[in-house]
């Protein structure tokens, strides 16, 4: 028996070391964004590109970003375990097909705020049924609050790896909140992770009456159980448009609890949770 073990050990050792290295080597994240967007979205993009590399060094993942959406192809995506859409979606059919294939094959994705937006007619028509109706599941954008304001968020699924370290209720950074066409609570494939708690109402300051919400149920972050994905409606910083200074008044990632959700979401998507 001892001879058998000594003979087999040299053969097993490289496999053991390889498995250990695979468990400890960083997973790779690639973020796509557009450089022509409104200041509030671009502010979040700049913030993400500043801080997500820091979060990566602290949590064992690498972070790259690009404005070249032609990189949504099989060869490029094969180098990454997680894809982020910071402020947009792909518009070219070949890019969309490559992204769908990536997700169908088990890739990870997290989309923020405007990455889920579609409205017909607009510059971003709802012309991608799989993405908006099946994958994200929310359909078209319907309305939003204004100005960007903080909300009290409720953790709806306390067992999901992205939410386990969160308190049951927490205050978000100021954000422009979206209402959607479809009722996600009626979709059995959707697991709602975060929602706006009723103590947040009235939410928004107007000046238009419909920009202030007084009641209702509004999902903020969710996952589609058929895919390795999370959509997060947060991603719109407050900007001083009214006075014409365009000064940044708030930052999404200036919130330790909110950052904890993003980090744990990425770790789950990267296969580490």
Task: Give the positions of each predicted feature.
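Extracytoplasmic/secreted proteins, especially bacterial periplasmic and envelope-associated proteins
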Residues: 47-51, 94, 98, 130, ...
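Polar helix-capping/helix-linker motif
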Residues: 73-74, 160, 251-255
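Catalytic beta-strand/loop cores that center a nucleophilic Ser/Cys/Thr
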Residues: 144-231
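Bacterial Sec-dependent N-terminal signal peptides
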Residues: 1-24
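Helical hinge/lid and interdomain linker segments adjacent to catalytic or ligand-binding clefts
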Residues: 23-119
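Extracellular ligand-binding/catalytic regions of CAZymes and related secreted enzymes
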Residues: 22-28, 43, 51-54, 58, ...
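A glycine-rich, often tryptophan-bearing local segment used as a flexible ligand/cofactor-contacting loop or short
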Residues: 89-165
């Amino acid at each position: 028996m001892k001879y058998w073990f000594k003979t087999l050990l040299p053969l097993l050792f490289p496999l053991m070391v390889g498995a250990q290295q695979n468990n400890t080597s960083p997973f790779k994240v690639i973020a796509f964004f557009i450089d022509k967007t409104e200041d509030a979205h671009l502010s979040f993009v700049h913030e993400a590109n500043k801080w997500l590399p820091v979060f990566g060094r602290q949590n064992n993942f690498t972070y790259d970003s690009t404005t070249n959406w032609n990189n949504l192809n099989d060869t490029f995506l094969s180098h990454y375990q997680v894809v982020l859409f910071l402020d947009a979606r792909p518009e070219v059919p070949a890019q969309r097909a490559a992204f769908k294939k990536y997700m169908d094959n088990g890739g990870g994705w997290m989309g923020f705020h405007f990455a889920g937006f579609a409205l017909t007619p607009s510059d971003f028509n709802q012309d991608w049924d799989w993405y908006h109706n099946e994958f994200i599941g929310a359909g078209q954008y319907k309305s939003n609050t204004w100005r960007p304001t903080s909300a009290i968020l409720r953790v709806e699924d306390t067992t999901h790896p992205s939410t386990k370290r969160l308190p049951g209720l927490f205050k978000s950074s100021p954000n422009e909140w979206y209402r959607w066409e479809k009722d996600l609570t009626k979709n059995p494939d959707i697991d709602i992770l975060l929602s706006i708690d009723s103590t947040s109402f009235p939410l928004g300051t107007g000046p238009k009456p419909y920009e202030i919400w007084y009641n209702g149920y509004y999902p903020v972050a969710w996952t589609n159980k058929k895919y390795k994905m999370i959509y997060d409606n947060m991603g719109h910083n407050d900007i001083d448009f009214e006075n014409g200074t365009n000064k940044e008044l708030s930052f999404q990632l200036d919130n330790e609890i909110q950052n904890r959700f993003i980090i744990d979401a990425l770790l789950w998507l990267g296969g580490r949770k």
